[in-house]
Amino acid sequence: DIVLTQSPASLAVSLGQRATISCRASESVDNSGISFMNWFQQKPGQPPKLLIYAASNQGSGVPARFSGSGSGTDFSLNIHPMEEDDTAMYFCQQSKEVPWTFGGGTKLEIK
């Protein structure tokens, strides 16, 4: 299975500043020029919401302050400017190989 290592495990960011979350895969999640890396946001009591798919594409209705980048094994999610509503858990997920696997999560809070 592909192992995803997220960092940091927790992060506190001031309103209006930038939050950066990293995800490293144990092997490349690229195939045919596509990076099969996705990012999800989860709030307590709610199902995960897709933010970013294929490394850098925004999900439907996702605000422009969320962006993703990376390829191969190294990826990042950026949130800028940070808003109060962005307090949540964030997870990377690879969909290159079954079983699809998730990172351990990052808890994002307001500083």
Curated annotation (Swiss-Prot):
Record-linked SMART domains: IG (SM00409), IGv (SM00406)
Entry's Gene Ontology BP terms: adaptive immune response; immune response
Region named Framework-2: 39-53
Cysteines paired by S-S bonds: 23-92
Residue numbers spanned by region Framework-1: 1-23
Domain of life: Eukaryota
Family matches, as InterPro entries: Ig-like_dom (IPR007110), Ig-like_dom_sf (IPR036179), Ig-like_fold (IPR013783), Ig_sub (IPR003599), Ig_V-set (IPR013106), IgV_Light_Chain (IPR050150)
Residue ranges, annotated region (Complementarity-determining-3): 93-101
Any GO CC annotation of this UniProt entry: immunoglobulin complex
Further details from the record: This is a Bence-Jones protein.
Cross-referenced PANTHER family: IMMUNOGLOBULIN LIGHT CHAIN
Protein name: Ig kappa chain V-III region MOPC 70
